[in-house]
Protein backbone atom coordinates (compact mmCIF):
# COMPACT_ATOMS: atom_id res chain seq x y z
CA UNK A 1 0.00 0.00 0.00
CA UNK A 2 1.13 3.55 -0.72
CA UNK A 3 0.72 5.97 2.18
CA UNK A 4 0.53 9.64 1.25
CA UNK A 5 1.97 12.05 3.80
CA UNK A 6 1.69 15.83 3.77
CA UNK A 7 1.77 18.79 6.14
CA UNK A 8 -1.00 21.06 7.39
CA UNK A 9 0.07 23.92 5.12
CA UNK A 10 -1.87 21.96 2.49
CA UNK A 11 -4.99 23.01 4.43
CA UNK A 12 -6.41 19.50 4.36
CA UNK A 13 -8.33 19.21 7.63
CA UNK A 14 -8.60 15.89 9.56
CA UNK A 15 -12.04 14.87 8.26
CA UNK A 16 -11.01 15.38 4.64
CA UNK A 17 -7.65 13.71 5.22
CA UNK A 18 -9.47 10.59 6.38
CA UNK A 19 -11.74 10.72 3.35
CA UNK A 20 -8.77 11.09 0.98
CA UNK A 21 -6.67 8.48 2.76
CA UNK A 22 -3.76 10.78 3.55
CA UNK A 23 -1.90 11.63 6.75
CA UNK A 24 -1.39 15.29 7.65
CA UNK A 25 1.41 16.32 10.01
CA UNK A 26 0.54 19.61 11.75
CA UNK A 27 2.75 22.67 11.72
CA UNK A 28 2.61 24.88 14.80
CA UNK A 29 1.38 28.38 15.54
CA UNK A 30 2.64 30.13 18.69
CA UNK A 31 0.49 32.94 20.06
CA UNK A 32 1.85 36.03 21.80
CA UNK A 33 1.15 34.49 25.23
CA UNK A 34 3.22 31.40 24.38
CA UNK A 35 0.29 29.10 23.63
CA UNK A 36 1.18 26.61 20.89
CA UNK A 37 -1.60 25.55 18.52
CA UNK A 38 -1.41 22.55 16.22
CA UNK A 39 -2.51 23.76 12.81
CA UNK A 40 -5.86 22.27 11.78
CA UNK A 41 -6.39 20.55 15.13
CA UNK A 42 -6.59 22.85 18.14
CA UNK A 43 -8.60 25.69 16.58
CA UNK A 44 -10.86 25.94 13.57
CA UNK A 45 -9.70 28.54 11.05
CA UNK A 46 -12.62 30.82 11.96
CA UNK A 47 -11.78 30.63 15.66
CA UNK A 48 -8.15 31.38 14.89
CA UNK A 49 -8.88 34.42 12.71
CA UNK A 50 -10.97 35.89 15.53
CA UNK A 51 -7.86 35.56 17.73
CA UNK A 52 -5.57 36.91 15.01
CA UNK A 53 -7.53 40.14 14.73
CA UNK A 54 -6.94 40.80 18.44
CA UNK A 55 -3.21 40.00 18.43
CA UNK A 56 -0.90 42.99 18.87
CA UNK A 57 2.06 40.78 17.99
CA UNK A 58 1.84 38.48 14.98
CA UNK A 59 1.85 34.78 15.98
CA UNK A 60 4.84 32.79 14.80
CA UNK A 61 4.67 29.62 12.73
CA UNK A 62 7.06 26.69 12.90
CA UNK A 63 7.70 23.32 11.30
CA UNK A 64 6.54 20.05 12.88
CA UNK A 65 8.53 18.04 15.37
CA UNK A 66 10.79 15.44 13.66
CA UNK A 67 9.39 12.81 16.05
CA UNK A 68 6.00 13.01 14.33
CA UNK A 69 7.59 12.06 11.03
CA UNK A 70 9.73 9.36 12.62
CA UNK A 71 6.71 7.62 14.16
CA UNK A 72 4.86 7.72 10.86
CA UNK A 73 7.77 6.18 8.94
CA UNK A 74 8.24 3.47 11.55
CA UNK A 75 4.55 2.54 11.44
CA UNK A 76 4.61 2.41 7.64
CA UNK A 77 7.76 0.27 7.62
CA UNK A 78 6.27 -2.15 10.16
CA UNK A 79 3.23 -2.58 7.92
CA UNK A 80 5.38 -3.02 4.81
CA UNK A 81 3.89 0.09 3.19
CA UNK A 82 5.50 2.59 0.83
CA UNK A 83 5.43 6.32 1.58
CA UNK A 84 5.03 9.34 -0.66
CA UNK A 85 5.71 12.63 1.12
CA UNK A 86 4.39 15.86 -0.41
CA UNK A 87 5.33 19.06 1.42
CA UNK A 88 5.19 22.83 1.11
CA UNK A 89 7.99 24.61 -0.70
CA UNK A 90 11.38 24.27 0.96
CA UNK A 91 11.89 27.96 0.16
CA UNK A 92 9.13 28.85 2.64
CA UNK A 93 9.62 26.33 5.44
CA UNK A 94 12.02 23.78 6.88
CA UNK A 95 9.27 21.13 6.90
CA UNK A 96 10.58 19.45 3.73
CA UNK A 97 14.06 19.11 5.20
CA UNK A 98 12.67 17.95 8.54
CA UNK A 99 10.69 15.18 6.85
CA UNK A 100 13.73 13.96 4.91
CA UNK A 101 16.00 14.09 7.94
CA UNK A 102 13.54 12.03 9.97
CA UNK A 103 13.47 9.37 7.25
CA UNK A 104 17.27 9.20 7.32
CA UNK A 105 17.32 8.88 11.11
CA UNK A 106 15.00 5.87 11.16
CA UNK A 107 16.67 4.39 8.07
CA UNK A 108 13.52 3.44 6.16
CA UNK A 109 13.25 2.33 2.56
CA UNK A 110 10.47 2.83 0.03
CA UNK A 111 10.01 6.52 0.83
CA UNK A 112 9.94 9.18 -1.89
CA UNK A 113 9.56 12.93 -1.47
CA UNK A 114 8.04 15.60 -3.68
CA UNK A 115 8.67 19.26 -2.92
CA UNK A 116 5.42 20.83 -4.07
CA UNK A 117 7.26 24.12 -4.74
CA UNK A 118 3.94 25.56 -3.61
CA UNK A 119 1.84 26.08 -0.51
CA UNK A 120 -1.72 26.15 0.76
CA UNK A 121 -4.25 25.56 -2.03
CA UNK A 122 -1.49 24.70 -4.51
CA UNK A 123 0.07 22.11 -2.23
CA UNK A 124 -3.36 20.69 -1.42
CA UNK A 125 -4.21 20.35 -5.09
CA UNK A 126 -1.01 18.38 -5.73
CA UNK A 127 -1.91 16.05 -2.85
CA UNK A 128 -5.36 15.49 -4.34
CA UNK A 129 -3.76 14.61 -7.67
CA UNK A 130 -1.54 12.08 -5.88
CA UNK A 131 -4.66 10.49 -4.38
CA UNK A 132 -6.22 10.35 -7.83
CA UNK A 133 -3.13 8.69 -9.31
CA UNK A 134 -2.92 6.18 -6.47
CA UNK A 135 -6.55 5.21 -7.06
CA UNK A 136 -5.70 4.70 -10.74
CA UNK A 137 -3.13 2.07 -9.74
CA UNK A 138 0.07 4.01 -10.39
CA UNK A 139 3.19 2.82 -8.57
CA UNK A 140 5.08 4.92 -6.03
CA UNK A 141 7.76 5.87 -8.54
CA UNK A 142 5.19 6.62 -11.23
CA UNK A 143 3.18 8.90 -8.93
CA UNK A 144 6.28 10.80 -7.81
CA UNK A 145 7.37 11.22 -11.44
CA UNK A 146 3.90 12.35 -12.49
CA UNK A 147 3.79 14.91 -9.68
CA UNK A 148 7.17 16.35 -10.63
CA UNK A 149 5.79 16.91 -14.11
CA UNK A 150 2.42 18.17 -12.89
CA UNK A 151 3.80 20.79 -10.55
CA UNK A 152 5.27 22.60 -13.56
CA UNK A 153 1.65 23.26 -14.54
CA UNK A 154 0.40 24.12 -11.04
CA UNK A 155 -0.54 27.70 -10.22
CA UNK A 156 -1.73 29.59 -7.16
CA UNK A 157 -3.02 33.15 -7.48
CA UNK A 158 -4.29 35.02 -4.43
CA UNK A 159 -5.52 38.50 -3.54
CA UNK A 160 -4.37 39.95 -0.22
CA UNK A 161 -6.58 42.35 1.72
CA UNK A 162 -4.10 43.61 4.32
CA UNK A 163 -0.36 43.35 3.71
CA UNK A 164 0.59 43.91 7.34
CA UNK A 165 0.49 40.18 8.03
CA UNK A 166 2.87 39.26 5.21
CA UNK A 167 5.07 42.20 6.10
CA UNK A 168 5.26 41.31 9.81
CA UNK A 169 5.92 37.67 8.94
CA UNK A 170 8.90 38.58 6.77
CA UNK A 171 7.46 36.93 3.65
CA UNK A 172 6.71 40.05 1.67
CA UNK A 173 8.77 40.74 -1.47
CA UNK A 174 9.74 44.37 -2.00
CA UNK A 175 7.66 44.63 -5.19
CA UNK A 176 4.54 43.51 -3.35
CA UNK A 177 5.23 45.92 -0.50
CA UNK A 178 5.45 48.86 -2.90
CA UNK A 179 2.23 47.90 -4.70
CA UNK A 180 0.34 47.29 -1.49
CA UNK A 181 1.42 50.59 -0.02
CA UNK A 182 -0.53 52.49 -2.67
CA UNK A 183 -3.94 53.67 -1.51
CA UNK A 184 -6.73 51.27 -2.46
CA UNK A 185 -4.43 48.87 -4.29
CA UNK A 186 -4.87 45.14 -3.74
CA UNK A 187 -1.83 43.10 -4.79
CA UNK A 188 -2.13 39.67 -6.36
CA UNK A 189 0.51 37.20 -5.32
CA UNK A 190 1.58 33.86 -6.71
CA UNK A 191 4.20 31.23 -6.01
CA UNK A 192 7.13 31.28 -8.42
CA UNK A 193 10.05 28.89 -8.03
CA UNK A 194 8.76 28.11 -4.57
CA UNK A 195 8.70 31.73 -3.37
CA UNK A 196 6.03 34.40 -2.95
CA UNK A 197 6.03 36.67 -6.01
CA UNK A 198 4.00 39.50 -7.47
CA UNK A 199 1.28 38.42 -9.91
CA UNK A 200 -0.41 41.76 -10.50
CA UNK A 201 -2.29 44.53 -8.76
CA UNK A 202 -5.74 46.04 -8.88
CA UNK A 203 -7.74 48.87 -7.39
CA UNK A 204 -10.46 47.75 -5.00
CA UNK A 205 -12.16 44.39 -4.56
CA UNK A 206 -13.94 44.25 -7.95
CA UNK A 207 -10.64 45.01 -9.66
CA UNK A 208 -8.95 42.22 -7.72
CA UNK A 209 -11.38 39.66 -9.11
CA UNK A 210 -10.92 40.92 -12.67
CA UNK A 211 -7.14 40.80 -12.29
CA UNK A 212 -7.30 37.28 -10.88
CA UNK A 213 -9.49 36.08 -13.77
CA UNK A 214 -7.13 37.66 -16.29
CA UNK A 215 -4.17 35.97 -14.65
CA UNK A 216 -5.87 32.57 -14.85
CA UNK A 217 -6.26 33.00 -18.60
CA UNK A 218 -2.67 34.27 -18.99
CA UNK A 219 -1.40 31.16 -17.23
CA UNK A 220 -3.05 28.83 -19.71
CA UNK A 221 -6.57 28.31 -18.45
CA UNK A 222 -7.68 25.45 -16.25
CA UNK A 223 -7.22 21.73 -16.90
CA UNK A 224 -10.36 19.61 -16.77
CA UNK A 225 -8.35 16.67 -15.41
CA UNK A 226 -8.28 17.97 -11.83
CA UNK A 227 -10.90 20.30 -10.29
CA UNK A 228 -9.58 23.73 -9.32
CA UNK A 229 -9.43 24.64 -5.64
CA UNK A 230 -10.68 28.00 -4.35
CA UNK A 231 -9.88 29.22 -0.86
CA UNK A 232 -10.62 32.03 1.56
CA UNK A 233 -9.57 33.05 5.04
CA UNK A 234 -12.60 34.82 6.51
CA UNK A 235 -15.75 34.34 4.44
CA UNK A 236 -16.84 31.87 1.77
CA UNK A 237 -18.57 34.79 0.04
CA UNK A 238 -15.12 35.90 -1.08
CA UNK A 239 -14.86 33.00 -3.53
CA UNK A 240 -18.40 33.12 -4.95
CA UNK A 241 -17.37 35.41 -7.84
CA UNK A 242 -14.57 32.94 -8.64
CA UNK A 243 -17.00 30.02 -8.75
CA UNK A 244 -19.36 31.95 -11.02
CA UNK A 245 -16.58 33.04 -13.37
CA UNK A 246 -15.14 29.55 -13.77
CA UNK A 247 -18.49 28.00 -14.55
CA UNK A 248 -19.92 30.76 -16.76
CA UNK A 249 -16.82 31.89 -18.66
CA UNK A 250 -14.49 28.90 -18.73
CA UNK A 251 -17.11 26.13 -18.53
CA UNK A 252 -15.13 24.51 -15.71
CA UNK A 253 -16.56 22.11 -13.18
CA UNK A 254 -17.46 23.81 -9.91
CA UNK A 255 -14.21 24.24 -7.97
CA UNK A 256 -13.67 22.77 -4.56
CA UNK A 257 -13.86 25.44 -1.86
CA UNK A 258 -11.84 25.31 1.34
CA UNK A 259 -11.07 27.70 4.17
CA UNK A 260 -7.39 28.57 4.43
CA UNK A 261 -5.86 27.31 7.66
CA UNK A 262 -4.05 28.89 10.57
CA UNK A 263 -0.42 28.70 9.41
CA UNK A 264 -0.98 30.18 5.96
CA UNK A 265 -3.66 32.52 7.26
CA UNK A 266 -1.18 33.97 9.74
CA UNK A 267 0.79 35.37 6.82
CA UNK A 268 -2.06 35.99 4.35
CA UNK A 269 -4.32 37.59 6.94
CA UNK A 270 -8.13 37.86 7.12
CA UNK A 271 -9.80 38.82 3.85
CA UNK A 272 -7.44 36.94 1.54
CA UNK A 273 -8.81 34.67 -1.17
CA UNK A 274 -7.32 32.73 -4.05
CA UNK A 275 -7.42 29.94 -6.59
CA UNK A 276 -5.15 26.97 -7.28
CA UNK A 277 -5.35 25.12 -10.57
CA UNK A 278 -3.48 23.07 -13.13
CA UNK A 279 -3.22 24.74 -16.53
CA UNK A 280 -4.31 23.07 -19.74
CA UNK A 281 -0.78 21.93 -20.48
CA UNK A 282 -1.15 19.20 -17.85
CA UNK A 283 -0.92 15.70 -19.32
CA UNK A 284 -1.61 12.62 -17.22
Spans of features found by a protein language model:
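Short, contiguous strand/loop micro-motifs
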Residues: 1, 59-60, 86, 117, ...
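Mixed-charge interfacial surface used for oligomerization/domain docking
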Residues: 3, 9-23, 28-30, 35, ...
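Class I S-adenosyl-L-methionine
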Residues: 35-85, 89-108
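Local beta-strand N-terminus motif with an aromatic residue
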Residues: 1-2, 80
